[in-house]
Amino acid sequence: MANLSYKGFTIGVEEEYMVIDPVTRELKSHEQKIVHEGQKLIKDKVKAEMHQAVVEVGTDICQDIDEAFMDVSTLRKTISGIGESLGLKLGASGTHPFSHWESQLITDHVRYSEIVNELQEAARSNLIFGLHVHVGMENREMAIHIANSARYFLPHVYALSTNSPFWEGRTTGYKSFRTKVFDKFPRTGIPDYFESIEAYENYVKLLVKTNCIDNAKKIWWDLRVHPFFNTVEFRICDIPMTVQETIAIAALFQALCAKLYKLRSQNLNFMTYSRALINENKWRASRYGIDGSMIDFGKETEVNTRVLIYELLDFIDDVVPQLGSRHAVNYVHNMLEQGTGADRQLKVYEQTNSLVDVVDYIHGNFLTGI
């Protein structure tokens, strides 16, 4: 076991940013000006999203967490600079504090037209901003095994990412309202357990055959085996406010995959739980963030969420040194101390009673730590 290598657990990070009008602080439909200018500098690492007020960026395949940090930092600086040159601001929050989706324009693209035509108001109202983390796998069989076990930990990491307490000018009472918005889509949420990659692929084939989807990219679960790459894609998290938070979360997902791989290599398996049970913890994470409690299914008892996150850190600790991600994983302690993005947004609002000030705070932290 001493020779076990984790070099195959590469990292890819996708972030979705909000485009902000510097005067009104509303979301700004910008006709893809940032995307067009960005593609001159970073090519296909910047993409349009369904709403014009959203810009999506994606890193290269990163060999370790330091490379991912540099790539995400460069992307944030580049997009921020382009936005500034166009008289626009950027920010990272799972929802905009007060802009209404009805005022935002849909990007003119055949894929988005198809989605809107099928999903109607569910698609038009899906004005949200997420973080996706890809972790490389040696093969798809290993990917489905790791995905099955990793489902249990999704609410733990999601709680750390919560960064969407407001929706259309209202305090929602949730630390992450983003997933409540996204739940209107089909094929979302915690995935089922699949016995094998063949079982998963048969499921996909059935959906394609019966005209539910045209390809597996329209399976929008919180965690999925990517349809085209040998990766496990973690999709549950709100976009974090800062790059350090994004990288800490990416490091957690990478280490979790490595730990589950290590157990598999020792002919050990982590207990798998039903979607129904995991959904209970997901709801708690959405509502309370890191300040609530979750269910420890093994002990059949409630446990403080922070305690469970510390237990997750202990669980992955033995693989962190070989991954070279100690500093990134350790930043989770800062996140637990300073509160999540949602906690900080709510604190600003409590102090100022101004959602405009909340937007300014979000924008002001876009390049923090870079």
Predicted regions and their residues:
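Acidic, His- and aromatic-enriched active-site or binding-groove loops in soluble protein domains
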Residues: 109-130
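Short secondary-structure capping/junction motifs at helix and strand boundaries
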Residues: 85-93, 141-145, 158-162
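An exposed, glycine/acidic-rich loop-and-rim segment of catalytic or binding clefts
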Residues: 139, 147-194
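Short, low-order "capping/linker" segments at domain edges
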Residues: 101-113, 173-186, 281-282
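An acidic- and aromatic-residue-enriched active-site/binding cleft used to recognize and process polar
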Residues: 22, 88, 93-98, 131, ...
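C-terminal accessory/tail domains of diverse enzymes
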Residues: 1-86, 115, 182-370
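Internal, well-ordered domain-core segments that constitute the primary functional module
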Residues: 124-150
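Short, glycine/charge-rich beta-strand/loop segments that flank catalytic centers
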Residues: 87-104, 168-172
